[in-house]
């Protein structure tokens, strides 16, 4: 008997339902972490997303040198956020 089977039996749910709920919980936790990381970077520059940060750099309100690492981090985090949201729709 697998761990999934034992836990499912203990909580009177099917293994499939347990896995589905586990995946959802994991993805929601991951999404919360990503959104928190996005918030920290966005707040630092007073923007909502990577496009606003890019706009501030282009207008000279933020130097490219200062925002370089955060720009790519924010871009990657926003991509990760969308990926997680799509996975949540499928679960």
What is each PLM-predicted segment?
Residues 83-91:
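Long amphipathic alpha-helical coiled-coil segments
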Residues 13, 20, 27, 56, ...:
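Amphipathic alpha-helical coiled-coil segments and their boundaries
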Residues 20, 24-34, 38-41, 74-84:
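Amphipathic alpha-helical coiled-coil segments
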Residues 1-24:
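Short, charge-rich amphipathic alpha-helices with coiled-coil/heptad character
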Residues 1-4, 59, 81:
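Low-complexity, intrinsically disordered short peptide segments enriched in small/polar/basic residues
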Residues 40-64:
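Short E/K-rich amphipathic alpha-helical oligomerization segments
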Residues 14, 29, 48, 91:
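Residue-level signal for short amphipathic helical patches enriched in basic/charged
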Residues 1-4, 34-37, 43-46, 90:
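A broad, low-specificity signal for short, low-complexity segments enriched in glycine/proline
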């Amino acid at each position: 008997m697998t761990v999934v089977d034992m836990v499912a039996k203990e909580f009177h749910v099917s293994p499939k339902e347990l896995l589905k709920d586990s995946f959802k919980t994991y993805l929601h936790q991951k999404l919360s972490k990503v959104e928190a990381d996005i918030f920290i970077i966005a707040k630092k520059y007073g923007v909502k997303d990577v496009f606003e940060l890019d706009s501030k750099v282009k207008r000279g309100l933020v130097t490219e040198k200062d925002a370089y690492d955060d720009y790519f981090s924010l871009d990657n985090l926003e991509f990760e956020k969308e990926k997680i949201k799509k996975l949540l729709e499928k679960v």
